[in-house]
């Protein structure tokens, strides 16, 4: 499936987990709130029933925060991991004219996912091919990545970033609740309840 968002992403050094705060907005007018994270909570919405759910990550404690980081944060952490890790990896950088193609192959005993920092997933009760592959396409003109591909044995995902505008605001001016619709019922997120098409 294909999903399109307008994303406002802020580097957030105070957040030691993801390292970024962000909101996903609908592409029709760039105003409809879809999802948000502010370094402390993630905010999910169901427009059909006018409901907001807030997850402060305490109901179901995990060693990572279960959300997909925004594009540039994700790419930055892939590169940082490749430069700093002592894991078994193979990297290649191909000059493709107007862009570079970077490929990272992780040969560990378990798959590696990025929730901000890299996290070695626990082995499942059945065999899963553990190789993890990440690829980045990087513009030479501005040094920014514009495409990311993640390949696991069970799933392949691709994310493309276009029409980039450099954010001139600072993180101290970001409030995720400024983007949340007014008049919606607010509830605490329940991991045991059906999601009912909550945007994430």
Give residue ranges: language-model regions.
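Hydrophobic/aromatic beta-strand elements that line small-molecule binding cavities or substrate pockets
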Residues: 2-11, 33-34, 132-138, 159-165
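An acidic-aromatic
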Residues: 6-70, 155-157
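Short, hydrophobic/aromatic-rich segments at coil-to-beta transitions
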Residues: 14-23, 96-103, 119-122, 142-148
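Short solvent-exposed loop/turn micro-motifs enriched in small/polar/acidic residues
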Residues: 26-29, 84-86, 128-131
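A short, structured loop/turn motif at beta-sheet edges
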Residues: 90-100, 137-144, 166-168
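Short helix-loop boundary/capping segments
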Residues: 92-131
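Non-transmembrane domains of secretory- and envelope-associated proteins
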Residues: 121-133, 141-200
């Amino acid at each position: 499936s294909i999903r399109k968002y307008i994303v406002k992403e802020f580097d957030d050094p105070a957040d030691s987990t993801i390292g970024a705060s962000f909101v996903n907005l609908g592409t029709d007018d760039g105003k409809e709130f879809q999802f948000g994270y502010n370094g402390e909570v993630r905010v999910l919405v169901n427009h059909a029933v006018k409901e907001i759910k807030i997850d402060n990550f305490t109901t179901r404690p995990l060693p990572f925060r279960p959300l997909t980081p925004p594009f540039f944060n994700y790419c930055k952490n892939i590169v940082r991991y490749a430069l700093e890790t002592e894991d078994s990896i193979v990297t290649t950088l191909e000059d493709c004219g107007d862009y570079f193609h970077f490929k990272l192959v992780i040969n560990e005993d378990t798959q590696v996912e990025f929730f901000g920092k890299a996290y070695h997933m626990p082995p499942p009760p059945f065999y899963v091919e553990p190789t993890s592959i990440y690829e980045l396409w990087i513009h030479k003109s501005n040094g920014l990545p514009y495409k990311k591909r993640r390949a696991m044995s069970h799933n392949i995902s691709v994310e493309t970033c276009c029409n980039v505008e450099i954010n001139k605001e600072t993180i101290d001016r970001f409030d995720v609740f400024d983007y949340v619709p007014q008049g919606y019922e607010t509830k605490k997120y329940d991991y045991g309840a059906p999601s009912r098409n909550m945007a994430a």
